[in-house]
Amino acid sequence: MSKVFKLHSEFKPGGDQPTAIASLCEGLEDGLAHQTLLGVTGSGKTFTIANVIANLNRPTMVLAPNKTLAAQLYSEMKEFFPENAVEYFVSYYDYYQPEAYVPSSDTFIEKDASVNEHIEQMRLSATKALLERKDVIVVSSVSAIYGLGDPDSYLKMMLHLSNGMIIDQRAILRRLADLQYTRNDQAFQRGTFRVRGEVIDIFPAESDDYALRVELFDEEVERLSLFDPLTGQIHYNVPRFTVYPKTHYVTPRERILDAMEKIKQELAERRKVLLANDKLVEEQRVTQRTQFDLEMMNELGYCSGIENYSRYLSGRGPGEPPPTLFDYLPADGLLVIDESHVTIPQIGGMYKGDRSRKETLVEYGFRLPSALDNRPLRFEEFEALAPQTIYVSATPGKYELEKSGNDIVEQVVRPTGLLDPVVEVRPVATQVDDLLSEIRIRAAKNERVLVTTLTKRMAEDLTEYLEEHGERVRYLHSDIDTVERVEIIRDLRLGEFDVLVGINLLREGLDMPEVSLVAILDADKEGFLRSERSLIQTIGRAARNLEGKAILYGDKITDSMAKAIGETERRREKQQQFNLEHGIVPKGLNKKIGDILKIGQPTQGRNKKGHKAVDTHEDYPLLSTAELEKEIQRLETEMYQHAKDLEFEKAAQTRDKLQTLRAQFIANS
């Protein structure tokens, strides 16, 4: 079989990686349903998985616990497989308020959402790649278990065009309207088309850098070509092209009509039940809402909140699982669950939270009972749909270990030869003063420190205390949004400050080679934040530095501490032994600071000649006050655009330049 995946990397597998790759591939070829890759922090788990994918040549879905880690994985996979289809599938909502009803105050909260168009395009691109290609890697969040349009309807709605095809122009326009494309002869953007004589330009919904030109001669397709929608420059001609629907929820007309009849039947039955129970207000509500939705579906082919009728639109029975991204994944697909100790419990918890909200809406007449089938997968449904699975974690959970049995592949030895941090236990009584002296030692060597506390109050007090003693310190907490969190991490790595204080610093899987010390305060207080798994994860934050060290402050050694210290020592001994046998000298990591969060953006390729914020203050010439003001306005616009496009690193860089220019502006004023 020819290789469809081409792995590009300057590195070759090292340490435990070759053994892990061979074991995982062998297990998958032998038909094992569940395997666990127990890889320590910094051991190159992503590179191992990339090698497994390249060796097996199977379409793969990688599940991550949140958007930040999904973006990090997407960025890494893009670098490993530049010639293959690496796609990104996460929730496309920048902001989402689901519809809800609070009976105690008789408050109905209307659904409100802000859709990120670029992520919507990436989602459509992901499903298109899964339907068209074998060399696909989709990096997804738990958004993958939520309802999506039915793949059968989606496939039936596609518009196939080819050179020499006999088709009337009006028929093409009608089909585009069925696919929910809109005609716009002025603003040509994603999901629109324009008509000029016998030429139809279509901007595919899943594309970010090309559009299709259809040239007709009478009723024959004379030429199909792809062109740049911005400049109009023709890239090349194509013999055929498939136009995919603008949304995953597009449905053939006959199925919509059939669904409408079933919705009317359900409405009639529901009205009888409500009237029999003297629920007159609820009966009036559900009748009014449903009839309005039916009218919209009849006229436009869709309505606001059409996903609540997904049971009828997908032709599934009551209680059956909704169609999801897993329905698009081929039967021979592979599933990789990253940070499985977090992701698996997340998958299990989604259904119940969604269900309780919808039951209230149904009970009070805001939705028909069939809306309950617009839901995420139950955990047992997820298990039934999941193909062969590899769980990846430094601290696998009970579920993964039980499912994998003896099929646990350890990746303890790092290719760089780096050892797990040295762990010390020190008394609580002097923890703050002891920490202060350790911070000063690290700051003098230009190294960074992570400090984790148990409570928000303690984190705030500690930050204030360290600031009073002249230390450069910042505080990371749950109220900080994703953009600012990435900025703080970047500033720590750049040396803008030396100490980062937080409560749950293991959450983001932070990769920071500059961190040489992790301090865990009140380590002897048993609980979620001081469990064996949490301690191992937190200790691992210092595992990417040659001088890595973890200090646990506690007056007694709890079971969790003993297990975490024991496991760290076991790994450290194994790593030292391997280095000794193979003559390896540990090397520090030199990770680029722009790597924390970088999603491929639609403007990257095309704007190379456009405005680019420069890297240093010296690059700015001595501008007049008016010119400075103009430049500040331009950079502000650029910064907000980067943030909107999820280019958090670029937004932070532009912010830094803005601060420099503002200081210059004030000095000149």
Curated annotation (Swiss-Prot):
ATP binds at G39, V40, T41, G42, S43, G44, K45, T46. Keywords: ATP-binding, Cytoplasm, DNA damage, DNA excision, DNA repair, Excision nuclease, Helicase, Hydrolase, Nucleotide-binding, SOS response. GO terms for molecular function: ATP binding; ATP hydrolysis activity; DNA binding; excinuclease ABC activity; helicase activity. Residues 629-664 form the UVR domain. The keyword DNA damage applies. GO terms for biological process: nucleotide-excision repair; SOS response. Residues 431-593 form the Helicase C-terminal domain. Residues 26-183 form the Helicase ATP-binding domain. GO terms for cellular component: cytoplasm; excinuclease repair complex. Pfam families: Helicase_C, ResIII, UVR, UvrB, UvrB_inter. It is found in: Cytoplasm. SUPFAM superfamilies: C-terminal UvrC-binding domain of UvrB, P-loop containing nucleoside triphosphate hydrolases. The keyword Cytoplasm applies. The beta-hairpin motif is involved in DNA binding. NCBIfam families: PRK05298.1 (NF003673), uvrb (TIGR00631). Belongs to the UvrB family. Forms a heterotetramer with UvrA during the search for lesions. Interacts with UvrC in an incision complex. PANTHER family: UVRABC SYSTEM PROTEIN B. The UvrABC repair system catalyzes the recognition and processing of DNA lesions. A damage recognition complex composed of 2 UvrA and 2 UvrB subunits scans DNA for abnormalities. Upon binding of the UvrA(2)B(2) complex to a putative damaged site, the DNA wraps around one UvrB monomer. DNA wrap is dependent on ATP binding by UvrB and probably causes local melting of the DNA helix, facilitating insertion of UvrB beta-hairpin between the DNA strands. Then UvrB probes one DNA strand for the presence of a lesion. This is UvrABC system protein B. It comes from Proteus mirabilis (strain HI4320). The gene is uvrB.
